[in-house]
Design a protein with these regions (language model features):
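Extracellular or lumenal secretory-pathway regions
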Residues: 1-101, 105-108, 115, 160-214
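Structural motif
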Residues: 111-112, 123
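Gly/Pro-enriched, hydrophobic low-complexity segments
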Residues: 117-181
Length: 214
């Protein structure tokens, strides 16, 4: 979502939960990175990009519409790792893996057949509402959200700048959850540098969240 304007972008995101780590990333980023790791796929990607530009159908470009980041929650090590491509720089940022300070509410609703409860928190300068399913005993969720007694099936900030909602679930026939090594060389940076580089890359200035931590 464009938090500084009125345009909204939607993208299919993937949350994969393993015994020791979880992954969260855009499906289109994974698709493109997989293509780039194969010479034939790389040529196909180039052809798709050229066709999109020539036809001015920019929505068909084989690139992520919102984020190319990969997020990993490492349970044993207690850290969240973000792998990001900022401009031409491959970056790796590590943070402490902590839970949000959730406050449970009385509201309930059904999401994909699961009875969900409402929880609220303030995180990184925004107020969030999350709907979690107690019958799915995983204290996980999209992006950096976690720490509720059930899987988070929907979460959004109160201004609806960011909104994640479950569209499907698969439990059988999946590959083991692991770190993807699409880009072997990363520059390790801290969160403040990451936010500065992100602001510079978007050319939209520094948003309120970044100002809070600088």
């Amino acid at each position: 979502v464009d938090t500084l304007g009125t345009d909204k972008n939607c993208e299919t995101m993937i949350l994969r939960i393993g015994k020791k780590i979880s992954q969260f990333y855009a499906y289109l980023s994974f698709y493109c990175d997989s293509m780039f790791n194969d010479p034939t796929g790389r040529r196909l990607w180039g052809q798709m990009m050229v066709q999109a530009i020539r036809s001015r159908n920019y929505a068909s470009m084989p690139t992520s519409k919102i984020t190319s980041n990969y997020y990993y929650k490492n349970y044993p090590e207690g850290k969240i790792t973000t792998l990001a491509l900022l401009g031409t720089t491959e970056c790796l940022m590590e943070e402490e893996y902590i839970s949000q300070d959730w406050k449970l509410a009385d509201s309930t609703k059904i999401i994909h057949g699961y009875q969900c409860r409402l929880a609220e928190c303030h995180f990184r300068g925004r107020n969030y509402h999350a709907w979690f399913a107690p019958e799915i005993p995983l204290n996980e969720g999209p992006w950096k959200f976690n720490g509720l007694p059930g899987l988070i099936l929907e979460v959004y900030d109160t201004q609806d700048h960011y909104h994640f909602t479950l569209i499907g679930m698969q439990q059988e026939g999946t590959e083991p959850v692991c770190y993807y090594n699409f880009r072997p060389n990363y520059e390790k940076i801290d969160r403040i540098k990451y936010l500065k580089m992100s602001a510079s890359r978007t050319h939209k200035g520094v948003d309120p969240e970044i100002k809070k931590v600088l």
